[in-house]
Amino acid sequence: MNNLESWEAVIGLETHVQLNTKSKIFTSASTAFGDAPNTHIDPVVCGLPGTLPVLNETVLEYAVKTSLALNLNVAEHCKFDRKQYFYPDLPKNYQISQFDEPLAENGWLEVEIIEKDKEPYIKKIGIERLHMEEDAGKLVHSGSDRLAGSKYSLVDYNRAGIALCEIVSKPDIRSGKEASEYASEIRRTVRYLGVSDGNMQEGSLRCDVNISVRKGPNAPFGTKVEIKNMNSFSAIQKACDYEIARQIEVYENGGKIFQETRLWDEAKQLTKSMRLKEGSSDYRYFPDPDLGPIEITKAQQEIWFKELPELPSKKRYKYVSQFGLSAYDARVISDEISMANFFEETVANGAEAKLASNWVTSDIVGYLKSNKLSFSELKLSPENLAEMINMISKNIISGKIAKEILPELIQKNISPKKLVEEKGLAMISDSSSISPIIDELINEHPNEVQAFKNGKTKLLGFFVGQLMKRTKGKADPKLANKLLMEKLNS
């Protein structure tokens, strides 16, 4: 067995975020996903002679906003370069990217790490750079998930030329859990900004992981290995954990780690070698002669900075420090901006924050999951949820009744007060209405009454249940318990 504790993992992530602009980065071709292959291409995408790329201004805006949200220093001057390599999914035989003068450098992102049976902590992960580039096309392999072993391959250039932001972290990550949480926080951030949907299944967010191991925090870095083909956050964590253990085992058995690219095999839960890793010199970068330099003034940066929303980390802090929520609930609510906004508007409409949190994270999220809906598809208004919560607090309805009417409120988005009045569901809160029913129950169950008086006090629950059955759950629970105790002990 490997002695994992004597080793330290060193991990960095390269995260590719596909920007959700309507047109591609250097042409007006559509970025629509899921259409027939090769229907969103044009002479610029294909690199035909005589065509010239023109930068999409929205791409620059989205990239700068992402940089500012990640605490990066945005350059006032940057340029595009040609990254040259030959592969079937690259129609021009080069990719327009940024090399030595990226859009932004030297930022950071704070990530909350919560693991079972461990103390939660905040990890500050450095970000080396963010640069803009165009995406490549997509290869479809017949009879295999990769080129090797396939009968033939087809190329779909619909994705080619879609705008990407590549976010390169510093090697500050030390575990698979930290890697997956960092990637998750990147996705959360770009979704809040509205610059990407971050959908890993559709390729809108893709992560490559660079991993090495060393003997303790002061030892020199080991040889790094790049891992690709991780399509979920859990896959990122599992791939990192596997590769860390693999490298340690190789070293402890006297072997050598090669600088290579490996693929994560989800079915077999392991990494396997793909190719030796290229260096940057292999790509023969040089400035793109068809694209001029980009100037981004401080004044323009300030305008875009003021347009940034409140980001997830600030919301989590606010929910815990001001609203009194648990760290877990704060994290669940802040995960989606639509959920966070709904929660805050519910509180703004008079609902107590912890009660609003409970209803949002439990009952509403549960309903949406069971009906395969996203939070952005929720029809219920924050005003109506706040009204229902306040009706519970004022003993107008019971929590049980509230749970029963919630699906109808969600489906129709009608006033809870109006619905309760129409269905006669208001709580019975006066003694004169409850006492006669209790008297009937006592007369009908003399044996249970005597057993209660003889010390079987758990029978109180039996009488409460019978009372709720008679009143269809509308009796005030506190008043019901009080009156039952008085009458059973008399």
Curated annotation (Swiss-Prot):
Disulphide-bridged cysteine pairs: none
GO MF annotation terms: asparaginyl-tRNA synthase (glutamine-hydrolyzing) activity; ATP binding; glutaminyl-tRNA synthase (glutamine-hydrolyzing) activity
PROSITE patterns: GATB
Enzyme Commission numbers on file: 6.3.5.-
Organism domain of life: Bacteria
A biological process term (GO) from this entry: translation
Membership in a protein family: Belongs to the GatB/GatE family. GatB subfamily.
Protein name: Aspartyl/glutamyl-tRNA(Asn/Gln) amidotransferase subunit B
Originating organism: Prochlorococcus marinus (strain AS9601)
Lineage: Bacteria, Bacillati, Cyanobacteriota, Cyanophyceae, Synechococcales
Gene name per UniProt: gatB
